[in-house]
């Protein structure tokens, strides 16, 4: 029979796993906001770049917390690109390409990780 500590550790591990799945579901939903931000950046909306930076910063930290290093790394990469975009001229084609590519890489990683975890992806 497990003692209280062992049972408590198992319950904590189960709770963290459930929170990780919630993170994946939420992040799948945030991919829509990320795509909208990138599109708005292409249209010249500087506030969308700042919003993109905030979203990716949150995904970066939370992904690492719940054991999704690939998601965390791609979010960190996109966060750095967004920070650089804030210092670049609005509409810089090279920067816009980097934003689009970074968003694509993050989306691919989130979708692959969610699929592997059994989280359904809405199209």
Predicted regions located by residue number:
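Short, charged/polar, low-complexity loop and linker segments
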Residues: 6-11, 39, 50-54, 84
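Extended, amphipathic alpha-helices with heptad-repeat/coiled-coil or helix-bundle character
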Residues: 46-84
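A ubiquitous short alpha-helical element
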Residues: 15-23, 42-43, 62-69
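Helix-loop segments that flank and shape redox-cofactor active sites
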Residues: 33-50
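Amphipathic, coiled-coil-like alpha-helical segments
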Residues: 2-13, 17-35, 87-123
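Amphipathic alpha-helical interaction segments
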Residues: 31, 37, 74-76
